[in-house]
């Protein structure tokens, strides 16, 4: 059993991107589903679906590539807040990633959302990861 499911998810996506796999399988949780939904809305992944196998739920994520050389859409994916060191930010100090070309995923009291939506709503929260 993995202690940090978010880091496990991000690492699996990063590794699959490096070897240009089309699909990556991740153990499903509420948080991983919320992160996958944001990645899909922002255009970083193609699609995702859940399935059950031996009473365990998994998430299948379809990764996106561009061009003939199949360059990954996700250039970098980085965990910020970790179980040993939580990172919080208020709405005024939410990070801008590459002048808003990338996103930060924030866990707020109103759910998991991007830094842009959290800033728009005027709420802060725990900075989970950066993606660009």
Curated annotation (Swiss-Prot):
State the source organism's domain of life.
Answer: Eukaryota
Keywords, sorted A to Z: Chloroplast, Plastid, Ribonucleoprotein, Ribosomal protein, RNA-binding, rRNA-binding
Give the matching InterPro entries: Ribosomal_uS8, Ribosomal_uS8_CS, Ribosomal_uS8_sf
User: What is the first-listed, main subcellular location in coarse terms?
Assistant: plastid
By its UniProt entry, which Gene3D superfamilies does this protein fall under? 3.30.1370.30, 3.30.1490.10
Q: Could you tell me one molecular function GO term of this UniProt entry?
A: rRNA binding
* Disulphides: none
Q: Which family does it belong to?
A: Belongs to the universal ribosomal protein uS8 family.
Alphabetized HAMAP family for the sequence: Ribosomal_uS8_B
Q: What does this protein do?
A: One of the primary rRNA binding proteins, it binds directly to 16S rRNA central domain where it helps coordinate assembly of the platform of the 30S subunit.
Q: How does the annotation summarize its subunit structure?
A: Part of the 30S ribosomal subunit.
Identification of the protein by name? Small ribosomal subunit protein uS8c
Gene encoding this polypeptide? rps8
């Amino acid at each position: 059993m993995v202690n940090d499911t978010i880091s496990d998810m991000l690492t699996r996506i990063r590794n699959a991107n490096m070897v240009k796999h089309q699909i990556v399988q991740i153990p499903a949780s509420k948080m991983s589903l919320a992160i996958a939904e944001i990645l899909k809305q922002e255009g970083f992944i193609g699609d995702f679906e859940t399935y059950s196998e031996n009473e365990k739920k998994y998430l299948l994520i379809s990764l996106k590539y561009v061009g003939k050389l199949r360059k990954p859409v996700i250039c970098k994916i980085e965990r910020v807040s970790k179980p040993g060191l939580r990172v919080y930010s208020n709405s005024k100090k939410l990070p801008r990633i590459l002048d808003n070309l990338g996103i930060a995923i924030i866990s707020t009291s109103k759910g998991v959302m991007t830094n842009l939506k959290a800033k728009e709503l005027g709420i802060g929260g725990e900075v989970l990861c950066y993606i660009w």
